[in-house]
Amino acid sequence: MEPTVQDDPQRSLERIRSELWDPTVCLERVAPGVTPHLDLSSLGLHSVRESALGAYADLGRGELDRAVATLRAVLTHQYDAPGRPWDGTFRVTAEQADPPGADAVEWLHYDPNWRQFLGAILAVTVLDHRAVLPADVVDGVSAAVVRCAIGEPEERIPEWYTNPNLLHAWVDAHAGLFTGDDTLVERGRRRAQQTIDRFEHASDVDEYNSPTYDGVDLLAAALWVVHPPTPHFAAWGRSLLDGLCDRISTLVDTQLACVCGPYWRAYGIALDRYVSLLGLWLHVAGVERVLPAAVDPGTDHVHDLWFLPLVTRLASSVTPPWQLRPVDSERRYVQRFDDVVAISILRPGRNVGWATGPVPEFAADQYVPFVAHCVRRDGTVAHLGVRPGEDVELVDAGEVTRDAFRVRLKSSGRPVTVGIDGVELQVEANRLVDRDGVVVVESASAKTSRWTPMPSGWSLHAADPELLITLTPHA
């Protein structure tokens, strides 16, 4: 692989934050790259979560005054609405309107998971920096963490929803420690055990192989180890780190700087095209090209870069047990979840992964059941991901030959739109062909379907579409 000059992500973060900091409200503006293909920066919005993470970063650099001002501003954006489903969560932006009462729609008018993210960020801020914070800020932050805990409806987070369960278990237990409430501590311990039991039953997390949410799970596990509210958390956190790092180490191709698919939840296919939480962890571990070479406010998903100071601090304390190594011979990895099977194959110069079974109902637009990465002649990497569209119920994928793969998408005969992520693919004779010819995508219904360009690649509209994908790596 050709070497790529990588900007220092920490310096990039400091530069971006200095550009986005708004001293008039003591918060950070929303960056253009937060929502890919939709620049919201002209609206003058201010991000609450990233501002809290910025305060944590400032405390680590000794910038106490700005951190204190930011924390005081952040605390004003927590909802205090007992009995409402948004009680205890935070506005996503400072300008977000209050939820419209009984007509409020979850994820549209409020983000319930901001209880978990802001609760964890604020709790670790107090735990790491209590000694330098003014008493009113310590009290205010601690009270906000407690409100995050008690505002969470008991049954809102399904058992399979890994990342908020991991975070909220820790937030609950620490809220109990902050107040001396043993009931909250025990509630957090029960949620943690429930999540660990599922992890041990399946030998992995439900949000399997997700470049962003694996990073959140690593962060939560590290918090359990570094600041365990009970001894159980330390042991369970270490078990989570061991299991996650083992699987991720197997699926990471350090030469191609990618994670072999399939992905249960992904915002992108190529780690060097957007910022992911897992990319931050791998960067801290010394893996190259797992973040964009240059990160600026317009980089896709740039807001996840704000986690870098916290990831760096946690990684230095827990030393994740990575076993990262080049792919010099074939690796195969199989993961089963009831009626879904995920298969990953890594060979020198290319890797491919697919899942067979029902499409998840939650976050189906982030599901990528077929993923391929393949090296070109010039050393760059071609990336391909197949995303089932709405109404796709089942994916049936597998090997045809060593270099050819078939992907069938079942939709009860209804026409569906399938997304093909791959910005460097071009249409040739109604096939999608990578610029170096290392990836070719053909439709079995080529005569009755057409490829349509979209920002991240192409889409195909057909009934029960079937794709034949051929890889020809130049190793």
Q: For the regions a protein language model found, what residue spans apply to each?
A:
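Ser/Thr/Asn(+Pro)-rich, low-complexity disordered segments
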Residues: 2-117, 121-123, 130, 138-153, ...
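Extracellular polysaccharide-recognition and catalytic grooves
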Residues: 120-124, 139-323
